[in-house]
Design a protein with these regions (language model features):
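Short acidic-hydrophobic, aromatic-tinged amphipathic segments that line or gate anion-handling sites
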Residues: 2-9, 180-185, 305-310
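General beta-strand structural signal in soluble alpha/beta enzymes
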Residues: 103-107, 125, 155-157, 180-186, ...
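Conserved small-residue-rich beta-alpha loop and adjacent elements
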Residues: 105-171
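C-terminal core of ALDH-fold dehydrogenases
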Residues: 319-430
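A glycine- and small/hydrophobic-rich beta-loop-beta segment
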Residues: 256, 260, 268-343
């Protein structure tokens, strides 16, 4: 498999290099909307029908039972349980540090304002199964949801052919405090959480990655009264390397991203010709050892190495692309990264692989893709909260601020707004 190498491209060629694999959500729209409408109208009957059609499983009960939970938990090796608990601890520490103390501010004498974060009452988590059951996604979503104070955490994940959920997903859900787990995948799972059925409760916000059908479903329900975490597309990584970078590390990071899916994208940026020349051969060497080679090769078909002429161009290229993941293989990684303003999550130094953030460093792996890192943050504690503002004004405060409000209301010709202040001021002065 040959990775495309761009040598000293001009700036007007950057757009071509940065082109991402596109999901044609428009062509999926009718199929997705039909499934969503069926779930809205038919409830559990539609869910069972689509599970039989798409996941090839006949389900009596949609919700995971206590007995199924215990059976699944017992099947998880102790070594994996220990690793999951350590990851939970790190994720909890990092997200707990994001909590903000409520602070009252006196904006003018007698006028107090403050803001209070409140957990979203009902949230839905979508955890992909398919080619790789992503139990790590349970940790990334359920830990901050519980920290934020969400009252009900509902999770949907597709069952295997025997109608069972992957044991590691069940263990992760139990350890993070997920309230209810449903054996549902795809568009039908998103519809169930968005609209509610006889078995599945309706939620207020849906989180989690998925294939293009899941992404299209999330976008459709987001204009029907249900919030979603962010728009999302294929996963991606950009790697920046200096002359001191180890080409083995670079190739390993490049391939770990390609392993996410056939439409994932990896881009290596460097100004060092030796790195650019050695890299393709190292990719081939490591690729031969991967069991998912055929899957990874599809991703590599739209990945590339970019050899730039000037150091100053590196940060410009990164900020223009706005990668989901940015790995900085540089001796001056932290200093260099101070110029980065568009990225989902940044991994600094030679010994910080992206997989650390995917699993256990503590940061969240649910991140904006497709250039959305220019305008969206990754999932964090705030993602699971709403901020309610409060204000309280004393009689003296209204004396001070009232004339300002009256003047502005009169200028906007909103007499009732002005009168709401005037009647109070008259009461104070009488």
């Amino acid at each position: 498999m040959t990775v495309t190498v761009w040598k000293y491209p001009k700036r007007d060629e950057w757009k071509v290099i940065m082109a991402r694999p596109q999901m044609d959500l428009i062509s999926l729209s009718r199929t997705v909307s039909d499934i969503l409408e069926s779930v809205r109208c038919e409830g559990d009957d539609a869910l069972r029908r689509y599970e039989k059609q798409f996941d090839r499983v006949v389900l009596d009960a949609l919700q995971v039972t206590p007995a199924e939970m215990e059976e699944g938990v017992a099947a998880v090796p102790e070594s994996l349980k220990k690793a999951i608990r350590q990851a939970i601890d790190n994720i909890r520490k990092f997200h707990a540090s994001q909590a903000i103390e409520v602070k009252k501010v006196e904006t003018s004498p007698g006028v107090w304002c403050w803001q209070k974060p409140v957990g979203i009452e009902k949230v839905g988590l979508y955890v992909p199964g398919g080619t790789a059951p992503l139990f790590s996604t349970v940790l990334m979503l359920a830990v901050p949801a519980r920290l934020a104070g969400c009252h009900e955490i509902v999770m949907c994940t597709p069952p295997g052919k025997e109608g069972k959920i992957a044991p590691a997903i069940l263990y992760a859900a139990r350890e993070t405090g997920v309230d209810r787990i449903f054996k549902l995948g795809g568009v039908q799972a998103i519809g169930a959480m968005a609209f509610g059925t006889e078995s599945v409760p309706q939620v207020y916000k849906i989180f989690g990655p998925g294939n293009r059908y899941v992404m299209a479903a999330k976008q459709q329900v987001s204009v029907q009264g249900v919030a979603i975490d962010m728009p999302a597309g294929p996963s991606e990584v950009m790697i920046v390397a200096d002359s001191g970078a180890d080409v083995r590390f670079l190739a390993a990071d490049f391939l770990s991203q390609a392993e996410h899916g056939a439409d994932s994208q990896s881009i290596l940026l460097t100004t060092d010709r030796r790195i650019a020349d050695l890299f393709p051969a190292e990719i081939e060497r490591q690729l031969d050892r991967l069991p998912r080679r055929e899957w990874v090769e599809k991703s590599l078909s739209h990945s590339s190495v970019v050899l730039l002429e000037r150091e100053a161009d590196l940060a410009d290229f990164v900020n223009a692309y706005a990668p989901e993941h940015l790995i900085v293989h540089r001796a001056d990684a932290e200093e260099w990264a101070s110029a980065i303003v568009n990225a989902g999550s940044v991994f600094l130094g030679y010994y910080t692989p992206e997989s650390a953030g995917d699993y256990a460093s503590g940061t969240n792996h649910t991140l904006p893709t497709g250039g959305y890192a220019k305008s969206y943050s990754g999932v964090n504690l705030d993602s699971f909260t709403r901020k309610i503002t409060f204000q309280q004004i004393s009689s003296e405060g209204l004396k001070n601020l009232g004339p300002v409000i009256e003047e502005m209301a009169e200028a906007e010709r909103l007499e009732a707004h002005k009168e709401a202040v005037t009647v109070r001021l008259q009461s104070i002065h009488s």
